[in-house]
Amino acid sequence: CNCLIDRKGRLHEEFVRVSPTFIQEDLMYSLDRVGVDYFDLYLIHRDDPHVPVEALMDKMEELRIAGYFKAFGVSSWQPSRVAEAIAYCKRMNYRGPSVSSPSYSLVHAQYNRWPGTWYADDEFAQWHKDNNIALFAWAAQGAGFFADPPLPAYDPEKAPMLTKESFLTEENFERRRRAMELAKVHDCSATNIALAYVLSQDLPLAAQIGPQNSWELEDCIKAMEEIKLTPAELDYLRIKRDTYED
């Protein structure tokens, strides 16, 4: 197992820091705080559509050549901006972004749950494979949506309106029910089924998870090493068929 140092640019909720100047400033701050000379991978966290993508890519190529990171990517960028960045880098013969990091999970988000974030649907996920760019799926387990018992955050009576509109849909509750059903078949948790669903996609994909202790980490590893979902089970979770049996 190799150690990968992945550092995103700092996120400030009170103002946007996506510009060539701020990117360099935050990169230097992060290197100093972590105590390393370079990062294996550096991601621009969030986006500001008002800043020309050309200026951002020029700066990232400059910093890459200077040796501050080996590769870079973007996090929660909408598809058109990622495509624009790749196209510009090809024209300029830059290395370009190697990674795009939207959220991608068994949950089908109707809307972006938080401002400035982006949730990938199956079409955008497939786009990564077609364009040879890795998909780093954050909240790959559905942000706790498949926990049993359900988390208070997903109580229809108490959840914030944006969560209700984005996550608490009839489709997602059916996906949750089916994940719990398959969990009994595979002798695991529904959260593991949700993670196995993401890992089973035929995509250049890495799943970002958030275990809070060693037991949860070991449980997540089980989804990677032991749970092999069949094509019928994957379609069942997508609600494309009525049974998971072939």
What residue ranges belong to the model's regions?
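Short, acidic/polar
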Residues: 16-34, 83-87
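N-proximal short alpha-helices
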Residues: 12-15, 29, 166-167, 190
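Beta/alpha (TIM)-barrel catalytic core signal, keyed to glycine-rich beta->alpha loops juxtaposed to Asp/Glu
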Residues: 47, 51-245
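N-terminal small/glycine-rich loop or linker at the start of catalytic domains
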Residues: 1-14, 38, 43
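Active-site mouth loops of central-metabolism enzymes
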Residues: 9-22, 50
